[in-house]
Amino acid sequence: TAKETGLTPDHLAYVIYTSGSTGKPKGAMLEHRGIVNLAATQIGPLKLKPGSRMLQFASISFDACAWECTLALTSGAALHLASRVDLMPGAPLIKLLTEQKISHALLPPIALAAIPTDTRLKHLKTLLVGGDACSEALVKVWADGPDKRQLINAYGPTEASVYATTHRCDPHAHGNPPIGRPIANTRIYILDAQG
């Protein structure tokens, strides 16, 4: 039988600092419930399973690292670590994705933009883009195509345990992709300056 740890979903899981885009970086205290919910509700839609190969692209100081590690380990997927040199956008990243047969990755738009549009990454079946706004041009290149890839625009502040909304991108849609709908078991609220 499993030993009781005394932990509850309300207990602190980790503290991570925000980017400071609204002024000064601050420590976001994240509870177990947030990252567990993210993993529990996203493994299925992202088609993560034993045999999947998740790239650990984000620095440990960035919230996406928690997503990469948690989702890979809780789904039975392999988590692929690499040196910062091998993760450099462009030729090094292409080589890593190809040679390691990466099937799942969360990359910022700037990293995708550095990969030539004619690059074939046949093993990369699920690609999330986050950390900045995704453009229509990136969607046209990376969604579906000959490799039948799902491209998902992920959005959310650090305080939301990595991301709060997702949108599966349609390569035939016009304009930048929306931020999408809330992930399962969550709600979002659109507020004005008065709250």
Regions found by a protein language model. Name each.
Residues 1-195:
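Motif- and composition-driven signal specific to adenylation
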